[in-house]
Amino acid sequence: MKQDVRRIALAAVIPLFLIFILYLLKFLEVGMDWDFRRLGVYPMEQRGVFGIFAHPLVHGSLRHLLANTLPLFFLSWCLFYFYRHIASYIFFAIWIGCGALTFLIGKPGWHIGASGIIYGLAFFLFFSGILRKHVPLIAISLLVTFLYGGLIWNMFPFFAKETTSWEGHLSGAIAGTICAIAFMEYGPQRPDPFADEEETPDEESGEEGKEYEEEENTEVKADYN
């Protein structure tokens, strides 16, 4: 029980720390009257290269940040809880992959916010659970579909608002899907359903042999007397 509670708490450390940084930067931006938008991705221009690494840390408004907070925490917590041994690699790959793809396919302008990370995490958790065919992970896939299935519409220019970076959303989804495939052989795996059955015959044969030897020894002693 204590180990479960500890694991739950540890899985929340990095998500909470990241969210703390996001709010700290937003309050600094507002309080000091700074403009962090130039830390975002500007596609296919040199000034936008740094944004590949920094764009998830910047949000256009407090409302934008508030909208991203809960899904970012929940999805990243799921990643670090269920995939704890490979979570850091996946999170980093989605972060950089989302920024790099946005840099390549985005429309001119500054692309900011952690929405791409959210899409990346959602698509990773969904496809990873399906590909691994492991019941707890499939349950997470279904839960993600139930909670965030509507996100898919904001990946396309036909449904997204003009001010929404649908390219960032699509980039995150692609990065998450690629990670689900690339890391499929790592981390939690479906247990082998035949593992116990393969061991049972050996154990049973050992027990039968033991009983046979005991009976044989008894008969020898009787003849000797």
Residue ranges and their predicted role:
Residues 217-225:
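Short, charged juxtamembrane terminal tails flanking transmembrane helices
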Residues 1-215:
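A detector for small-residue-rich transmembrane helices and their helix-helix packing motifs
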